[in-house]
């Protein structure tokens, strides 16, 4: 189990005996997803998308040539700056402004897993896990976004949670804050859901993932055995 930094601290790799998770900071401010899958020894940029000039794209105006944000693998995407996918994070400020672009500020490693106040959670000994804390900020909106990634010594999972801090002078309304957003290679995947009713819970169904949005939810005000 390890959390290692490469390329002068611009790439971070979380690994154990089973899996690896890799992120990179581009242009010193954009946090992008690079890899999640079977364990790799060292990330060397294999599998990164190749960028080229295309029509109808909003181009990035900095040092990364031909990058367009609508196909950029953001680790935690937001809207309003050329990324037209569903955002993982969205706010409305007191003055009605909805634009928010938290950019990378720092990351650090802590032993164990941070405790979540008032929330159900996994409990683990401190020497059995490590956590990467990533801090992103939007100075204009006064928003600080904390992203947490916990990797375990003996389990092939990465545990994630987020925290938002308002250090500005305005009231901020959270419109959307997702548990995660994950970029995966273009392959054939299946979606597995568990549907049911009273005394017939957790019936498995699987089907291929297709283009478009798929949503599973329920309309009750508590944990339910049904989904819609």
Describe each region flagged by the PLM.
Residues 12, 19-25, 145-151:
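Broad, structure-driven detector of short, well-ordered beta-strand segments within folded domains
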Residues 1-9:
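Short, Gly/Pro- and small/polar-rich lid/capping loops
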Residues 78-155:
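Extended, loop-rich substrate-binding clefts of extracytoplasmic carbohydrate-active enzymes
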Residues 15, 28-29, 35-39, 50, ...:
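Acidic (Asp/Glu-rich), glycine- and aromatic
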Residues 13, 133-137, 163:
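Residue-level detector of beta-strand face positions
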Residues 64-70, 187-216:
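Beta-strand/loop-rich accessory regions of lumenal/periplasmic or secreted enzymes
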Residues 36-60:
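Acidic, aromatic-enriched beta-alpha/helix-loop junctions
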Residues 217-227:
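Conserved small/polar residues in nucleotide/adenosyl-binding loops
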């Amino acid at each position: 189990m390890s959390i290692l930094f490469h390329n002068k601290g611009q790439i971070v790799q979380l690994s154990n005996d089973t899996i690896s998770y890799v992120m990179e900071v581009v242009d010193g401010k954009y946090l992008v997803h690079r890899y999640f899958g079977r364990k790799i020894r060292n990330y060397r940029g294999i599998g990164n998308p190749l960028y080229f000039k295309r029509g109808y794209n909003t181009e990035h105006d900095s040092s990364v040539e031909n990058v367009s944000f609508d196909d950029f693998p953001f680790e935690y995407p937001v809207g309003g700056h050329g990324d037209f996918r569903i955002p993982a994070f969205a706010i409305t400020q007191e003055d009605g402004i909805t634009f928010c672009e938290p950019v990378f500020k720092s990351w650090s490693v802590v032993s164990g897993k941070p405790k979540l106040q008032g929330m159900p959670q996994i409990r683990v000994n401190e020497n059995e896990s490590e956590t990467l804390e990533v801090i992103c900020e939007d100075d204009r909106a006064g928003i600080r976004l904390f992203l947490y990634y916990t990797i375990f010594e003996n389990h092939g999972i990465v545990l994630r949670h987020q925290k938002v801090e308002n250090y500005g002078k305005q009231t901020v309304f959270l419109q959307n804050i997702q548990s995660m957003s994950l970029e995966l290679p273009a392959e054939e995947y299946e979606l597995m859901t568990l549907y049911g009713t009273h005394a017939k819970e957790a019936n498995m169904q699987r089907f291929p993932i297709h283009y478009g949005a798929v949503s599973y939810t329920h309309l009750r005000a508590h944990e339910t055995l049904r989904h819609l």
